[in-house]
Amino acid sequence: MVGGLIALLVVLAAASAAGFAMRRRQGRFRSAEPTPAAPTQAASSGRPAPSPDALSAADLGAPLGAQATLVQFSTQVCAYCGPTRELLTEVARDRDGVAFVEIDAAERMDLTRRLHVLSTPTVLVLDALGGISSRASGPVRRGDLLTAVGAVLDPGGAS
């Protein structure tokens, strides 16, 4: 009886710790795993060629921002997608060269699978070439979003 109670307490403690750890990561941006870019230059722009995992305007169904693009994967039953959309729209509107694109994860399963989107909202911050700079899953915090966007707009300086 006492052994069973101890086992139950251990399981509850482990589950609580796991839940706390997941909650702390939710909505926080993390750097994307970079895929080495081809060393060649993009013919038309003279800039480095985009990485192989970069997203194009054709992938998104909308033009990329001149400096950055905020991409939100949403679903109809997502409780946090509306507030996240409002925040991303505001940040894109207030910063020159930043675009916002919302993608219905259920309608674009090709991208959902390719980018390993497991929950909504998932937010990607893309650079000017469509390379994924960072991503977050869950409700996004304004400060974290501004830091992630700042890292793309001014990669060498403070944001």
Which residues does each predicted region cover?
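N-terminal targeting signals for export/organelle localization
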Residues: M1-S51
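Anionic-ligand binding region
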Residues: A49-S51, L55-G61, A66
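Short active-site neighborhood of thiol/selenol oxidoreductases, capturing the structured segment around
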Residues: L64-Q76
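The canonical Cys-X-X-Cys-His
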Residues: C78-C81, V123
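Typically the conserved alpha-helix immediately C-terminal to a functionally engaged Cys/Sec
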Residues: G82-D94
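Thiol-based oxidoreductase modules, predominantly thioredoxin-like and allied folds used
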Residues: D96-D110
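Structural micro-motif
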Residues: H116-L124
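Non-catalytic, surface beta->alpha helical segment in thiol-disulfide oxidoreductase systems
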Residues: V125-S159
